[in-house]
C-alpha cells in the first residue's frame, strides 16, 4: 500500500512547495486538484505545450507519483444542484453550469491521459449543497 496526500489541503501554496513538503513527511503519492481556480493546477493550461510532462517531472523529482486528479467542485455541477448555492463555483443557468462542469471534468480526464494517471475523482452532486458547506472552503 502507498500513502498519498491530497494537495488541495494546501491550495494556497504552490504545487511544488506542497510536493516537497509531503515528500519530506514520507508520503509517496500526490492527488492533484484540477477544478477551476484551485490555485495549483489548471487542467486546460497544463494540456498546452508539454506543461503536463513538466508537472509530472516536478512531482517525480520529489520522489512522488501522481495517484489521482480530483475535480471536486466543477464536476458537482454536472448533476447539480444548479441554484444560487453553486454560483460560487460557476454562475450561470442550469445548462451553462452543466456545460462548464462537463468540460472541466473532460479536461481533467484529458490531463490524466497525458500524465498517464488512471484515476480522476469527481463529485456526483448533492441536493441543497449550500446547506452543508461552502466550497471551496471559507478563509
Task: Name these PLM-found stretches.
Residues 6-10, 33-37, 71-74, 125-127:
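Active-site beta-loop-alpha junctions enriched in small/polar residues
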Residues 13:
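Residues that form or flank phosphate/diphosphate-binding pockets in enzymes
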Residues 31, 68-70, 121:
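Conserved beta-strand positions in the central sheet of alpha/beta enzyme cores
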Residues 19-26, 46-70, 107-116:
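Acidic (Asp/Glu)-rich catalytic clusters
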Residues 38-41, 67-68, 75-80:
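Short active-site-adjacent helix-start/loop capping segments
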Residues 33-60, 124-132:
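Glycine-rich, proline-tolerant flexible connector loops at the mouths of alpha/beta enzymes
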Residues 16-17, 61, 76-139:
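Active-site acidic/histidine proton-transfer and metal-coordination neighborhood
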Residues 1-4:
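Extreme N-terminal starter segment of soluble prokaryotic enzymes
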